[in-house]
Each structure stands twice: as C-alpha cells, then as structure tokens.
Amino acid sequence: MDFSIKPLDAKSTIGSIKTGCIAVAVFEDKKLSAGAQALDRKGEISAALKSGDISGKAGSTLLLRGVNGGTTERVLLVGLGKQDAVTEKDFNAAAQAVVRAFTTLGSSEAVIALPFDTVASRDSAWAIRCTILSAREAAYRFDSLKSKKEPTASGVKKIAFAVPAAAVNSAREAVTQAVAVANGIDLTKDLGNFPANVCTPTYLANTAKKMAKEFKLEVEVLDRKQLQALKMGSFLSVTNGSVEPPKFIVLKHNGGKAKDAPTVLVGKGITFDSGGISLKPGAAMDEMKYDMGGAASVLGTMRAIAELKLKLNVIVVIPTCENMPSGSATKPGDIVTSMSGQTIEVLNTDAEGRLVLCDALTYVERFKPAAVVDVATLTGACIVALGHHNSGLFTRNDDAHDALANELLTAGKVAGDTAWRMPIEESYQEQLKSNFADMANIGGPAAGSVTAACFLERYTKKYTWAHLDIAGTAWKSGAAKGSTGRPVPLLTTFLIARAQAAGK
C-alpha cells in the first residue's frame, strides 16, 4: 500500500481533485466539514445528511456517486461525531471505517480529506499516523505457511492525504514515521504468528543478523559456551530441557553521538513455553508460541527506528530459548546462580521468563545505559489485573523512575498503545523470601505480576529501569487469534520522543 501527501492551496483545492474516491467528514450535529462543503456544490451531501442517510456518528459511512459534477468518481462520507467534541476514539473509528470502505472499493486510488486537526490536543500528524496504521492493520495477512494463499483483496492501493500547503512537511514526516512503525508491527506479528518449529531461538538470531545487514546495525549472537563463560546460570537453567540451542542476541543502532548513553530494550524470547516440569494445561498451549512477544516487539521496534535512521543510540538485547520438560530439565526446588551472583530457588519452572531476563538485565550494566526497558509476556496475573487493554508498567518510585514512567505512559497514549502503572513496593519483596536461596522465583498467588516485577527489580539497581508486562496485549485468542504487534507503537513513539529531546 502506498501513501502520499496532496498539498492544497488556492490553485489545487479539494473540489478540483480528480481521483477514484474522496473521503470527507460530516458531523452528528448535521454539519459538514470544510472538505464536504467544497464538494457540496449541488447540495447532494447536505441532502444525504439531512435525510438521515448518514447519521454523522463516528464511524458511520455513506458512498455517493456523481457528486461535485463528476470530477471525482465517488465521495465517501464518514461520520466524525459532534463537531466541537471529536475525541481520539471518534477519529480512530472514522479512520477505521474509511479503511474498511476502501478495501471493497472499485478503485485503486483515493484521497482522504478529513479535518485532521479536529481532535483536541492532537495535531494533523497524529491523525495521519493513526489512519495509516489502521490501513496497514486491515491489509495485514499471515498466510506464508498456507499452500493456497488467500486472494489479495481488491480496492484502494494508493492513498493520498489532502492537507494545506503549510502542513505538508509535518504530514510527510508523519507518513514516513507511520510506515516505518507499520513495518515494525508487521515484523513483530510475523515472528509471533510463526509456530515454534519455525521461529526458534536460531531463527530469531538469524532475523537479527538479516536486519543488521539491511540497516547497517551492529549484531552479536552469544551461544551456550559464551553464556556459560558469563556465568548466566539462571538463563541457562531454563534451557536444560530443550534440544534447541539458546541464543543471546545483542543488536545496536548507533544513531546518536558516540558519547551519548544508549537506551536499552530487553525482550523476553521464550519461543515455546510448555512450563517445563511444572507443565502447563494442554488447553490453548499452542498459544505459548507467543511467549517470545517481548523479543518480537523489540526487534520490530528496532526495525522501525533503523528505517527512520533515528538519531539515538539504542541497543536491543534478547535472551531466547525454549522451556521444555525432559530428563535433563530443571526441577522444582533446584537452586541456580544468576550472573549477578544471587541465588534463586526455582519453585516453579513455569515462572521462567524472569529467570532469563534477570541475567540479561545484569548483562546490560556494561552499556552504562541512559535507561533500560524490559518487555515480556511475563505473567497471567497481569491479564487478571488489566485485561487485554493496557500493558502493565512497573518501575521504582523516585524522580528518575517517575520521569521514565511518564515518558512511557505518554508515548502509549499518543500511540494508542496504552500502559497502566502498577506498584513496586518493598513490602511485596517479602513474598520472594526463600529458606534455601537468596530468593524464590515465585511469591505465591497474590499480586503475581507485582512480585514478578519485584524479582526483576533486584537486578536493576545500577540504572534507571522500567518493566512492561505485555501478557495481555501481545496477542489475541479466539477467532481473531494472532499477534497484535504491541507494544511496537508505544516503544517507537517513546524512542522518537527521546531522539527529539536529545536533538534540542
């Protein structure tokens, strides 16, 4: 799908555009947008709104032909809600409705001439990004493993956004950013949707290598012997039951100044999680291929920022392996020594994500990072707490960590990929006490997402850190089963904002 900008000025107006379809907005209070007014020379649009053929409610649509004297073949009316109270939700509903209508349209090209600056506190660039991401979401298909591919949908393949000439530069930048983010989302979805016999730790490592070659990134992949030399006993304990070799991926984008400390993203990469000896129930176990959602999302984020040539130093670190039962697998009650030297009593082998992450969080100390954000499908408890709407955000409570949390929360709101801050307090650490080791890897059924974050927090004392639990947001179950691509929009928006702040 191709996206472009169509500048509007005194000579090039909405009324003079020749294309297969123009989408313009109408409002619930029976008012026309400026774009609709420009096409309503003979009153057809006003009549349709007045008669009730379209309500103007956000997301309502009506396709008309022969409007504006035929300079354009079709006019798609789309409702935006009440004119003076258009919300982000309203605009997104309208954008998604336009995209749905375009997929079945008998034209390959169209122009969107909505009032992109109609949402309070959001600019035209935000609206354009939302529309492009909606279009790419609708266009996404995962059929690479099917012997018979789904037929490619007809409809619009080229979309132009009609904007005033003064807004062209920011609009073009919005298109560039949105396409890069969409490419990152698609990569994340593909990696998540591949089965575990395809997307192995080696496959993830090869994906990182290909990305490094394409975008001139630095890459290093550590194997078992190197991990043993680093004394990553916690990470390696998870790998004991599988024949798949573990990998530890380090991918660097050196877009900032050499002296600038990097922002580090750590992604949990369990390519299949059976639970190990603490075996999961069989129902829906196939969905445990998504337990590498953190790894997939940080790779997708890296792809997006590399495509944008973001002026920021970013490092992605991925500890990746399978968690399988076998005669050599780690057993409940085993005690392992992490890279930090702290010992862990493994009371439940299905709480393995924190065991691989803690060694990665120790490893990244060497980069002297500006901030570290780990991303993981870590706990079912987070789904109980937050459902499938918000990712869980955890960090310490001080000025530096509050600032990092606010950066991530703001990025999530801007991107429509929201997170909710959860508590980390010393009182929860009591639940991780062990009679036989420095800590246990679980803290009982109460506040499971919090105690998991508290476990990770013990390995992050030397830098500013945040944890995103994406167990409820990384994929969908049921008829719409598949990877969502989250939290790539949040992470890319966060990094873009950091790059902009660094450039000031």
Swiss-Prot record:
Q: Which UniProt keywords apply?
A: Aminopeptidase, Cytoplasm, Hydrolase, Manganese, Metal-binding, Protease
Principal subcellular localization: cytoplasm
Q: Where in the cell is it found?
A: Cytoplasm
Q: What is its EC number?
A: 3.4.11.1, 3.4.11.10
Q: Name one Pfam family in it.
A: Peptidase_M17
- Please list the residues that bind Mn(2+) 1: D273, D350, E352
Instruction: Identify which residues the record assigns to the active site.
Output: K280, R354
Instruction: Describe cofactor binding as the record notes it.
Output: Binds 2 manganese ions per subunit.
Cofactors that this protein relies on:
Mn(2+)
Query: Which residues participate in Mn(2+) 2 binding?
Result: K268, D273, D291, E352
Function of the protein: Presumably involved in the processing and regular turnover of intracellular proteins. Catalyzes the removal of unsubstituted N-terminal amino acids from various peptides.
UniProt family annotation: Belongs to the peptidase M17 family.
The cross-references to HAMAP family, in alphabetical order and at most eight, read: Cytosol_peptidase_M17 (MF_00181)
Protein name as catalogued: Probable cytosol aminopeptidase
Tell me which species this is from: Janthinobacterium sp. (strain Marseille)
